[in-house]
Amino acid sequence: MNAAIEHVQAVAFDLDGTLCDSVPDLAAAAEAMLEQLGMKPLPAKVVESYVGDGIGKLVHRVLTNDRDREADSELWEKGFVSYMKYYRDHLSVFTRPYPETEAGLALLKSLGIPLVIITNKNEILAAELLKQLGLADYFSLILGGDSLPEKKPSPLPLRHAAEVLGIDAANMLMVGDSRNDIIAAKAAGCLSVGVTFGYGDMTLLSQDDTTRPDRIIGALPEIYENLQPQKNKDEE
């Protein structure tokens, strides 16, 4: 990301694969669920490929070992209860922020603009995970996949966040690692920023107009560096 960004009044972030690497704990919960159900475990890389649409969808995918199929409703219910019970108690055993996450958030906070979380993870789990990682105080709003009637790739969470903050969605950045983040941002009229260190393949996503982010970064501090010219102009 090498050009100044102007008129930004808020920055929204995805959580898993953007601020932190949570796959080890998500995969451990999947393994515990499968073991309890008498099923074979899946490699962590497979679980990683299923992340991004909320835990309900993740459980379907893990149980069927397929991105698009849904498990039998009775099996899914047992699996979901098992998964949630384990995951709630093991949110941050292995989950850690990416190396420059906290530095990037601190720099952005110094600009005086609000930071928000827009994730498809359940809101209560997202809030607790941020607390356990020591990141909760950076954010003025947390929206989870169950906070509103629709979640990403719907633009509703982004538009709702902008409304709560009292700004135009066009003045908010959406930072994420997946197609859901980019599609939601485009539909809401936000500038989309893709990260190269998450679970999504930015090279692949950039090949399609519908999933090509407006900017791509390799570390969160790059956002601050490109907002600095805006701050300097505002202070003149």
UniProtKB/Swiss-Prot annotation:
**Cofactor(s) required, per the database record:** Mg(2+)
GO molecular function annotation: metal ion binding; phosphoglycolate phosphatase activity
Catalysis performed (reactions): 2-phosphoglycolate + H2O = glycolate + phosphate
* Residues annotated as catalytic: 14
- Chain residues that bind Mg(2+): 14, 16, 177
Q: What is its EC number?
A: 3.1.3.18
Q: What's the superkingdom here? A: Bacteria
What name is this protein filed under? Phosphoglycolate phosphatase
- The species this protein was found in: Neisseria gonorrhoeae (strain ATCC 700825 / FA 1090)
